[in-house]
């Protein structure tokens, strides 16, 4: 078991004791259990219930949203963390936070906001996660109205940071993937105190691969139920070869490795049973058996491979690495390819994405025109504190990113109606 230190438990703002207890009571929870509770009770996490995973949150009778996906990632991350001797609450908290920075419409919304935000430092869902946890989520403020967000511990913010680097490097080069906006560099510097490199801590690594497992396994399950995904492709060698080519281009690896992964999956009785899904009670039981066994297959393999690669047996923060065996990575990549590409290649899905981006641009123009008064009340203080046009633009981006999809659509409709009225 890794020994976390007082530095790992430190928070950016020293909080006073809670004054409202009826009787004296010593809180037995550790700092990471408190971090987990803060994330679990946050508005930012609840808003994920109305944000797109692969298909929209209102599609189907059993919708999988960013929130349900995050709960699944948290459970898987807790399992990997427990197997490696990490703090289970810390790993679960990292899973809960991993998508908390996603804007309306998921990656499609992220692309639209990145285009809009070019003059104020860009937009990246992972960087927005750090910004929410350390500033935007209303929990802790000082006497000067400086917000510390949820005021999580150093280790918790580190565990939530998949890419612990700013957008711009010291030499001026720009990272495509980053976990911190340049303007928030002082926060990342505090989080990474004592860790000079830009590699993710082991808890964040566990969270990251848990995301891949949940994404691939559970989204395949959704696709099968909706009729968008058919596992029969694993036995159609012509279509499989084409799918492997697409998957390698989109997610990495080689087509040959993905075809080999299909060979391994075909050998599993649970895959054959799920391929015959017909919507019956037995069909759903077989499908749930597939998801359960695949998750266990991948979690167990990762734990054993990680242990084998670390003779000391100690994991935590910068000690140890999460190791993903090649076969596991290939199987997960193939399943992710099946889950995503069949949906993404649907013409109606692409048309829907075009409309989503149009709404985001419309809401942005509406907030720019309306200024302070058009913003949600919580964001007006940051607007007043802004010292440049770029900082005011960042406030607008923060406001849009915080919206649920339903809310964004209502604001877009109001904007369209106002434009029509104004002629």
UniProtKB/Swiss-Prot annotation:
It comes from the Bacteria. Residues 66-216 form the HD domain. The keyword Protein transport does not apply. The keyword Cell wall biogenesis/degradation does not apply. CDD domains: HDc. Keywords: Hydrolase. Pfam families: HD (PF01966), HD_assoc (PF13286). Gene3D superfamilies: Hypothetical protein af1432. One of its GO terms (molecular function) is dGTPase activity. One of its GO terms (biological process) is dGTP catabolic process. Belongs to the dGTPase family. Type 2 subfamily. This is Deoxyguanosinetriphosphate triphosphohydrolase-like protein.
